Amino acid sequence: MQNNEIQPSFLIQKVYTKDVSFETINSPACFKEQWNPSSDFNIDINTTKINDENFELDLTITVTTKNNETNAYIAEVTQSGIFTITSMSEEQIDSVLNTYCANTLFPYAKRIIDSSIIKGGFLPLNLAPINFDAIYLQKKSSPKREH
């Protein structure tokens, strides 16, 4: 018996950095103070359909760090990728983009954030792994906001 059913496929076409920003705030005073940092993280995922089989995903990570309640730095990167996804439903494609593709881009974004912070004169920041599956499920279960 021959199976003529087309199998789903996934291919990474390109991984690239779309935007990088690092800003030291309150320098040089911030380097003279006792270092007692607190950081806020923001993650944003945007997808763009290029054509029926190709999609761009932008993973933006923003880190805002304060030292003793005074802003010290803001580091931001948008790491992007182009992915070819075939023979999947729209719901499956959405899931693959927001989970697997985001997980693929995260290590690249993490390295750029870490490098920017160190080159900015600060101690390295340990960005923990991100559970993109949980973020996606939360996003899918939350009510949609009207604009």
Swiss-Prot record:
It is found in: Cytoplasm. Keywords: Chaperone, Cytoplasm, Protein transport, Translocation, Transport. It comes from the Bacteria. The keyword Cytoplasm applies. InterPro entries: SecB, SecB-like_sf. Transmembrane segments: none annotated. GO terms for molecular function: unfolded protein binding. The keyword Protein biosynthesis does not apply. GO terms for cellular component: cytoplasm. Homotetramer, a dimer of dimers. One homotetramer interacts with 1 SecA dimer. Belongs to the SecB family. HAMAP family: SecB. One of the proteins required for the normal export of preproteins out of the cell cytoplasm. It is a molecular chaperone that binds to a subset of precursor proteins, maintaining them in a translocation-competent state. It also specifically binds to its receptor SecA. This is Protein-export protein SecB 2. It comes from Francisella tularensis subsp. holarctica (strain LVS). The lineage of its organism: Bacteria, Pseudomonadati, Pseudomonadota, Gammaproteobacteria, Thiotrichales.
